[in-house]
Swiss-Prot record:
It comes from the Bacteria. HAMAP family: Ribosomal_uL2_B. Residues 37-58, 268-280 have a biased composition (Basic residues). This is Large ribosomal subunit protein uL2. The gene is rplB. Keywords: Ribonucleoprotein, Ribosomal protein, RNA-binding, rRNA-binding. GO terms for molecular function: rRNA binding; structural constituent of ribosome; transferase activity.
Amino acid sequence: MAIRKYKPTSPGRRGASVSDFSEVTRSTPEKSLVRPLHGHGGRNAHGRITTRHKGGGHKRAYRVIDFRRNDKDGVNAKVAHIEYDPNRTANIALLHFLDGEKRYIIAPQGLSQGDVVESGPNADIKPGNNLPLRNIPAGTVIHAVELRPGGGAKLARSAGSSIQLLGKEGSYASLRMPSGEIRRVDVRCRATVGEVGNAEQANINWGKAGRMRWKGKRPSVRGVVMNPVDHPHGGGEGKTSGGRHPVSPWGKPEGRTRHPNKASNKLIVRRRRTGKKHGR
């Protein structure tokens, strides 16, 4: 993938860029793997906003992705197409299995149309193949990693992300996360070899607020420019600093987003670097 820059023909085009979609080989998705997707605008079943800054955006259809890949062991599949997916930053690959079934997977870096991939403990160590962690050698770069055996891929699924398998000891494997955190995961969990493709996506300059609205992202308004009724930082004559430590609209201090007593915390060998004091 490469980035194509626009000429400054208007203020919105100045500095803006877009993917050239050179890796994409088909524009229409596989009809049998598409499901309707209804936008909720960040509202729950009661109509109340539970996630701010969401709403609008272009209509999308959901592509069903196979995140488990545990029921096709030993069955080879050919990469029929690399496709764009509006629901994620990575591209997706359409696989045609020898038994006639079709499935989507996240497209890793280097996977191209016509390649053959497979799943199972005896699969080769090459991009796109899916194996249990116990069958992957130490030092291998992987993505789409499960947290629980059979639970489906949860880690390293976005464009350009990857995890390094540092080693295995007993029934656990040590993984270095994209954040720098080192975490232990059951060796029965599956992972896909290689890093996620479309890494240049992070370098796109969106150019104007309207392109964010097309993606369903609404403006994020600072609390200090609101009225006192709307935010703890609101009000004051002229510009103010807010007058207190940063808090959410509901008065909770910023940061501290992790649950302190989460059961899986005992599997963290080394925490990510945050620039903050841990245990605040």
